[in-house]
C-alpha cells in the first residue's frame, strides 16, 4: 500500500489510558513503556505534527472500588485527578529526556508542580511545536478522562482524537470473549450508538459527535502504530460523521 509523503493530520489530541503506562505490571508506571511512548510522540513532533496529550490515572488510582466501599464520589474523583497529574509529570519527564519540549497543564491549580490550564497558552505552545500534556481531567468530578480528551480536543481544534487502547480497534464484540468478533475500519457516530459499541463513555462520545470531532481507536502496544495512523495508513478504527 502506498503511503502518504506527509502526515494527514496537523494537530492531534492523543488519549492514553493510565493502564497503558503500567505495561505488564498490575500497578504503577513501567519505565520502558513510558520511554517508548515518549519516543513515538517525538516522531510525531519531528514530522511537524502538533501534539496534545491526555493521560488517564487508572494505573495509580481507581475510585470506583472505594466509592462502593463508601468513599464520597467527589473525593474519589479528586484523587483520580491527582493520579493523572502524576502520570503527566512522568510523561513530561520522559519527553524532556528524549529532548522534546513539553509543558504540563493541570485543570486544578497545583502551583510549583505544573502550569494552570490556559486555552490561549496551550494554543500558543502547540503552534510553537511544544507538546502539551493536559492533566486533572476536566477539573470536575463525574467526568472521565475520555471526556477531558474530547473537551481539550475541541478546544484546541484538533483534527482528531487518537484513543490508544490495548486492542487493534473497535470490534463487533469483545474479541477476547468472542473469537468471531470482527474489527471495523470505519464507523459513523450513529453506527456506534445504534450498535451500542463500547468506544468511550456516552458523555465523551456525544461531545465529540456534536462537535464533529473524529475519533480513531488504535493499539498503542503495536510498535509504529501511532506513526502509521498519522500518515494515513490502514490502522485502527476511524469514527466520524
Swiss-Prot record:
EC numbers: 2.7.4.22
Main location: cytoplasm
Keywords from the named record: Allosteric enzyme, ATP-binding, Cytoplasm, Kinase, Nucleotide-binding, Pyrimidine biosynthesis, Transferase
Catalysis performed (reactions): UMP + ATP = UDP + ADP
Keyword GTP-binding listed: no
Entry binding sites for ATP: 15-18, 58, 62, 165, 171, 174
KW Transferase (keyword) present: yes
GO molecular function: ATP binding; UMP kinase activity
EC class: transferase
Highest taxon of source: Bacteria
Activity regulation (record text): Allosterically activated by GTP. Inhibited by UTP.
Residue positions binding UMP: 57, 77, 138-145
Residue ranges, annotated region (Involved in allosteric activation by GTP): 23-28
Record's subcellular location: Cytoplasm
InterPro entries, per database record: AceGlu_kinase-like_sf (IPR036393), Asp/Glu/Uridylate_kinase (IPR001048), Uridylate_kinase (IPR011817), Uridylate_kinase_bac (IPR015963)
Record-linked Pfam families: AA_kinase
GO cellular component terms attached to this protein's record: cytosol
One BP term from GO: 'de novo' CTP biosynthetic process
Biological pathway: Pyrimidine metabolism; CTP biosynthesis via de novo pathway; UDP from UMP (UMPK route): step 1/1
HAMAP family in UniProt: PyrH_B
Family: Belongs to the UMP kinase family.
Record's subunit section: Homohexamer.
Job description of the protein: Catalyzes the reversible phosphorylation of UMP to UDP.
Name the UniProt record assigns to this protein: Uridylate kinase
Taxonomic source organism: Pectobacterium atrosepticum (strain SCRI 1043 / ATCC BAA-672)
Gene name tied to this protein: pyrH
Amino acid at each position: 500500500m502506498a503511503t502518504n509523503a506527509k502526515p494527514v493530520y496537523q494537530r492531534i489530541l492523543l488519549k492514553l489510558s493510565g493502564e497503558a503506562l503500567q505495561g505488564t505490571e498490575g500497578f504503577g508506571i513501567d519505565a520502558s513503556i513510558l520511554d517508548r511512548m515518549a519516543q513515538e510522540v517525538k516522531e510525531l513532533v519531528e514530522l511537524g505534527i502538533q501534539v496534545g496529550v491526555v493521560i488517564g490515572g487508572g494505573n495509580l488510582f481507581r475510585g470506583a472500588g472505594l466509592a462502593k466501599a463508601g468513599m464520597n464520589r467527589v473525593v474519589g474523583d479528586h484523587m483520580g485527578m491527582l493520579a493523572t497529574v502524576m502520570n503527566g509529570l512522568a510523561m513530561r519527564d520522559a519527553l524532556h529526556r528524549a529532548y522534546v519540549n513539553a509543558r504540563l497543564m493541570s485543570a486544578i491549580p497545583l502551583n510549583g508542580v505544573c502550569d494552570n490550564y490556559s486555552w490561549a497558552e496551550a494554543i500558543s505552545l502547540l503552534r510553537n511545536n511544544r507538546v502539551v500534556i493536559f492533566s486533572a481531567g476536566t477539573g470536575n468530578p463525574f467526568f472521565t478522562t475520555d471526556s477531558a480528551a474530547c473537551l481539550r480536543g475541541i478546544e484546541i481544534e484538533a483534527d482528531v482524537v487518537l484513543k490508544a487502547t490495548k486492542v487493534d480497534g473497535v470490534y463487533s464484540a469483545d474479541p477476547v470473549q468472542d473469537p468471531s468478533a470482527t474489527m471495523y475500519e470505519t464507523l459513523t457516530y450513529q453506527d456506534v450508538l445504534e450498535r451500542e459499541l463500547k468506544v468511550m463513555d456516552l458523555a465523551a462520545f456525544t461531545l465529540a459527535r456534536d462537535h464533529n470531532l473524529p475519533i480513531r481507536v488504535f493499539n498503542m502496544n503495536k510498535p509504529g502504530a501511532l506513526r502509521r495512523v498519522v500518515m494515513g495508513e490502514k490502522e485502527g478504527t476511524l469514527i466520524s460523521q
